[in-house]
């Protein structure tokens, strides 16, 4: 009997890359003329980004700078879940952005449905925060990878442990 091939579908954000992107974004904010004298800041608290600025307009500018730096570092911005803009101390506004690590149950079901609609001989298992796909044929697995990549999912997915 031939050995089954498999791979895992995961959704991870590399925290060191996020830290590097925050540092370069803060450098740009300090050097930009339109941010001179403003109280703009970005902090990483565990897996939550806290954006702070003088007003909502500057907060959007801070967010744009951060997103551009995250994209340069290949950090998936789909995995950022922005909260509401709220008032903070000292006439500033704050917004929290949560980094989503792992695949939650709803997105795992969506991925499962995408794979089942293909009607290939593959098996899927939801394991905690990842989805394992197993099949006899590697061609089927590559077709699954192509289908999941082309699907419009609310999170960014990576494929690991391809065996």
Swiss-Prot record:
SUPFAM superfamilies: YajQ-like. GO terms for molecular function: nucleotide binding. Gene3D superfamilies: 3.30.70.860, YajQ-like, domain 2. InterPro entries: DUF520, UPF0234-like_C, UPF0234_N, YajQ-like_sf. GO terms for cellular component: cytosol. Pfam families: DUF520. It comes from the Bacteria. Keywords: Nucleotide-binding. Belongs to the YajQ family. HAMAP family: YajQ (MF_00632). Nucleotide-binding protein. This is Nucleotide-binding protein BA_1166. It comes from Bacillus anthracis. The lineage of its organism: Bacteria, Bacillati, Bacillota, Bacilli, Bacillales.
């Amino acid at each position: 009997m031939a050995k089954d091939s498999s791979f895992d579908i995961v959704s991870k954000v590399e925290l060191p890359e996020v830290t590097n992107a925050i540092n370069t974004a803060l450098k740009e904010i300090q050097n930009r003329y339109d941010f001179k004298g403003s109280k703009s800041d970005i902090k990483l608290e565990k897996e939550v980004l806290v954006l702070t600025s003088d007003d909502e307009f500057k907060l959007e500018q801070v967010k744009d700078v951060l997103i551009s730096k995250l994209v340069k570092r290949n950090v998936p911005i789909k995995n950022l879940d922005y909260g509401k803009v709220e008032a903070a101390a000292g006439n500033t506004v704050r917004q929290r952005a949560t980094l989503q690590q792992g695949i939650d149950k709803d997105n795992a079901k969506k991925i499962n449905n995408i794979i089942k609609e293909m009607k290939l001989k593959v098996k899927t298992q939801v394991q905690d925060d990842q989805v394992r796909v197993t099949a006899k044929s590697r061609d089927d697995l590559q077709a699954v990878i192509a289908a999941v990549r082309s699907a419009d999912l609310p999170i960014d997915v990576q494929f690991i442990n391809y065996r």
